[in-house]
Amino acid sequence: MAVFETQSLVAAAAALLLAYPVCKIVYNLYFHPLAKIPGPRAWAATRLPYCRALIQGTIVHDFEKLHQIYGPVVRTAPDEVTFAHGDAYNDIFRVRQGHKQFLKDPVWWARQKGQPDSILSAIRPENHARIRKILAPGFTTRALKAQEPLVQKYVNLLIQRMHDKASEVEDGKKGAEFDIGPWFNFTTFDIFGELGFGESFDCLENSRYHPWIALLFSSVKAAAFISAAKFFPLITLMLMKCIPESLKKVQRDHFQQIVDKVDRRLSWELDRPDFMSHVIKSDGTTKMPIGEIYATFMVMTTAGSETTATTLSGTMNHLVSQPDALAKLTKEVRSAFQSESDMTLDALHDLPYLDAVLREGLRTCPPVPWMLPRVVPRGGDTVCGTWLPEG
């Protein structure tokens, strides 16, 4: 009798385990508050297609295809909607009068357990504002203008390296072809190394990535695994164990490199201001907990380098693909300056076509290849004319 009862309980438990996901899928497809929003049914039913695309690194391209099929508003997960509309930025990211603020989605942005906050992971607006206030003086127009000689130094070195490449002989002809994308990365990382840590990564000098920069790119893959695991809280620990040890090591090594760089910079006085100068008090102590400095400068290293290089690469690609635009830009620049030394930040601001090209580059090649998810505030709200429930 006891054996029969045990078998019955096991069978009932198994039936419940099977019934739950089926019922959940039916609910998501037909009864969920987002059920009427267009989108692929497989993505609306479960998070699995979303997470697969995230781990494979195709999610941004998949979203673009979905918007081409379903329009500017697409349901890309049971509880997630994406927008490809000009009003979306103002509705989601700006604080609108009479509306509650859309906060960062903690599934994406919250720090990992046991890790310190960064300017990126700070969910509460007041915490983000505190960190931003400390760093802001380093990003004023006056502060950035003071760094112009340093920026010019690395831009000149980039131009020299490009001249060197153009002088190489390939297939018996002078003028070798080369991928300019990595060279933009070399430049922006070297500049941020000086501005953030008081010393260059010497990528341009050595014509290759610093080993730590290579680690940084590899760590993005680990971040995708971790983000996907967070969508399944009941089995997150088990999923985290499925992340390859090699990727976990990459993330650990990447963070340790940041720790070493920050500690090295804090150990000496620099003869010029940099971003870290605004974090250090006059008595040598810091305005932020050391953990927050590590985490924030890890974010800034990527945000201040790779993003700029991505936009420059995309903009250059558009220019070489459209000879008329390239010729017009070339004419504007060469008619405005007699020599390279005349190309100051102030002078470049006066070139309208250059400004238009850079703005169009930012529009067509956005430097952040991510969705930047936000949570609908309590009570729900409207985005681009579409009502969304809270959460």
Q: Which residues are covered by each model-predicted region?
A:
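N-terminal membrane-proximal hinge/A-helix region immediately C-terminal to the signal-anchor transmembrane segment
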Residues: 2-130, 152-157, 187, 204, ...
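Cytochrome P450 catalytic-domain "roof"
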Residues: 57-81, 103-122, 134-185, 189-202, ...
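Cytochrome P450 catalytic-core helices
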Residues: 188, 307-332
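Secondary-structure capping and boundary motifs in well-ordered enzyme cores
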Residues: 14, 127, 180-185, 208, ...
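Cytochrome P450 catalytic core segment centered on helix I
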Residues: 200, 213-284, 351
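Generic alpha-helical secondary structure signal
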Residues: 40, 126-134, 150-157, 227-231, ...
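Conserved hydrophobic/aromatic pocket- or pore-lining residues that grip, position, or stack substrates
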Residues: 192, 258, 279, 304, ...
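Conserved cytochrome P450 K-helix E-x-x-R motif and the immediately C-terminal K′/meander segment
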Residues: 53, 57-63, 256, 342-386
